[in-house]
Regions:
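Beta-strand-dominated extracellular/periplasmic modules and repeats
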Residues: 31-203, 209-230
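N-terminal secretory signal peptides and thylakoid transit peptides that target proteins
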Residues: 1-21
Length: 230
C-alpha cells in the first residue's frame, strides 16, 4: 500500500473505531433475516482484477474507502461517512468465517471510479476509493468505512456487493438504504419481494456528534446480516 506508516496506522484506528461503533449492541442492532441474499447484477462498473492491479489506486483497495494516499498526500472522501459492519451467515445462522466480501459504489457525486464511467478526472472524488475488500473473521464479520450511498440518474442509492466462500461459491447482490424515498422508483428494487427487500435494506443510524468527531467524522453506522445458501 502506498500509505506511509503513520497514515496506515491512522486508517487502522479509524476502521477500528467504526467497527466498535457498529458493534455496540446499545447503539444499533443487526438488521437482516433468514431470507437468503437474492442474486443481482454486478452492473457495468465492477472493478475487474486486472484493472485493480493497473488502475490509479493499485494496491490500495482496503476496507477504508474514505481515505486515499497518492503522491505522498492523503485525501479524504466527500460525503457522509458510514461505518458498515456486515455479518455473513448461512440459513441456520452459522457464521461463515473466511468469507471474502467486496463492495463498490459511486462517489457522492454519482460517479464510479471505473474507466467505463467516462467521467473526467475533475468530476470524480479523488478521496474516495470506490471499491474495497475484506475477509470475514471467526464471527463471520467484516467492517468497512465508506460513505452513505448516493443516487445517480435512474438508480436509488445502493452499494454493490460480492461474496465468495467455499461453501457457496460466489454471489453478487446490492444493498439499499431502508426507507430511502428513491427506492420506490428503482427498477431493481421494484422487482424484489418484501422478504428480499428486508434482506437487502440497511438500517442506518446516526452517530452521536461527539463520537463522530472522535471517529474522524463518522456520520452513520449500520450492522447488517447477509444470509447465504451454504
Amino acid at each position: 500500500m502506498s500509505c506511509a506508516p503513520t497514515r496506515l496506522h491512522r486508517r487502522t484506528l479509524l476502521l477500528s473505531a467504526a467497527a466498535a461503533a457498529v458493534a455496540a449492541p446499545d447503539v444499533v442492532r443487526a438488521a437482516g433475516n433468514a431470507t437468503p441474499l437474492p442474486p443481482m447484477t454486478e452492473g457495468p462498473f465492477y472493478p475487474q482484477p486486472a484493472w485493480r492491479v493497473r488502475g490509479p489506486f493499485a494496491g490500495d483497495w482496503d476496507a477504508d474507502l474514505t481515505r486515499v494516499a497518492r503522491a505522498g498526500r492523503e485525501r479524504v472522501a466527500e460525503g457522509e461517512h458510514l461505518g458498515l459492519e456486515l455479518l455473513v451467515r448461512d440459513t441456520r445462522g452459522r457464521a461463515l468465517d473466511g468469507a471474502a466480501v467486496e463492495i463498490w459504489q459511486c462517489d457522492t457525486w454519482g460517479r464510479y471510479r471505473h474507466p467505463r464511467d467516462g467521467a473526467l478526472p475533475a468530476d470524480v472524488d479523488e478521496g474516495f476509493q470506490g471499491y474495497g475488500e475484506a475477509r470475514a473473521g471467526a464471527q463471520g464479520a467484516v467492517s468497512f468505512r465508506t460513505i452513505r450511498p448516493a443516487p445517480y440518474a435512474g438508480r436509488t442509492p445502493h452499494i454493490h456487493l460480492k461474496l465468495r466462500h467455499p461453501s457457496f461459491g460466489e454471489i453478487t447482490s446490492q444493498l439499499f438504504v431502508d426507507g430511502e424515498p428513491g427506492n420506490a422508483g428503482d427498477f431493481l428494487w421494484r422487482r424484489l419481494s418484501a422478504a428480499e427487500r428486508a434482506a437487502l435494506a440497511m438500517k442506518l443510524q446516526p452517530v452521536p456528534a461527539q463520537q463522530g468527531a472522535r471517529d474522524g467524522g463518522l456520520r452513520w453506522q449500520s450492522r447488517h446480516v447477509l444470509v447465504v445458501l451454504a
